[in-house]
Amino acid sequence: MIKEILEKTGALMEGHFILSSGKHSSRYVQCARLFEFPEYGDIVGEELAKLLRKYDVETVVGPAMGGVILSYVVARYLKARSLFAERENGVMKLRRGFFVRPGEKAAVVEDVVTTGGSVKEVIELLKEYGANVVCVGSIIDRSGGKVDFGVPFESLLKLDLPVYDPEDCPLCKQGIPAEKPGSRGLK
């Protein structure tokens, strides 16, 4: 069902992409396209909330941009608070009056996990506040099982999409221009 939603909304894209991690791929999942349609965002959020419910989450935190809407929808179904972390001078921060209490059970959610870098930054940020990060959830896991957050990781769909280091990218070698659809590094 999730893959069909991604295809129907145009969220599953083909081309030459530079991922937030700096790696390259011929496929990209732009979950912002999925969230253009609230009915599909609700389905995805509810399904992820079902997977995370067993962790008794009090607060759901998503990294900007990919986790902002997702954290809100998942939190609504878990009857939890929703926050997002955003970069300030390249460092993840809780801003806009957001806070977590020491010991508060938090879930970190992200639309797509490839290397897990943004999620790991948010986990470290929450630990600095004394939060108890109990799980991570994502719509798409494209990590190939290579990421370890130190807590349970739940995803709605595992996609084995090609990922290349820039120097090994066959699309670069063919001279195909790359686009960077993610949000990291945008001003």
Curated annotation (Swiss-Prot):
Subunit: Homodimer.
Known role: Catalyzes the transfer of a ribosyl phosphate group from 5-phosphoribose 1-diphosphate to orotate, leading to the formation of orotidine monophosphate (OMP).
A Pfam short name: Pribosyltran
Cofactor(s) for this UniProt protein: Mg(2+)
The keyword Glycosyltransferase appears for this protein: yes
Pathway the protein contributes to: Pyrimidine metabolism; UMP biosynthesis via de novo pathway; UMP from orotate: step 1/2
Record-listed E.C. numbers: 2.4.2.10
Keyword rRNA processing on entry: no
Any one Gene Ontology molecular-function term assigned to this protein's record: orotate phosphoribosyltransferase activity
Protein name listed in UniProt: Orotate phosphoribosyltransferase
Binding residues annotated for 5-phospho-alpha-D-ribose 1-diphosphate, in chain numbering: E110, D111, V112, V113, T114, T115, G116, G117, S118
Reactions the enzyme catalyzes: orotidine 5'-phosphate + diphosphate = orotate + 5-phospho-alpha-D-ribose 1-diphosphate
Annotated keywords: Glycosyltransferase, Magnesium, Pyrimidine biosynthesis, Transferase
Positions of orotate binding: T114, R142
Gene Ontology biological process terms, A to Z: 'de novo' UMP biosynthetic process; pyrimidine nucleobase biosynthetic process
Organism for this UniProt entry: Thermotoga petrophila (strain ATCC BAA-488 / DSM 13995 / JCM 10881 / RKU-1)
Name of the top EC class for this enzyme: transferase
Assigned protein family: Belongs to the purine/pyrimidine phosphoribosyltransferase family. PyrE subfamily.
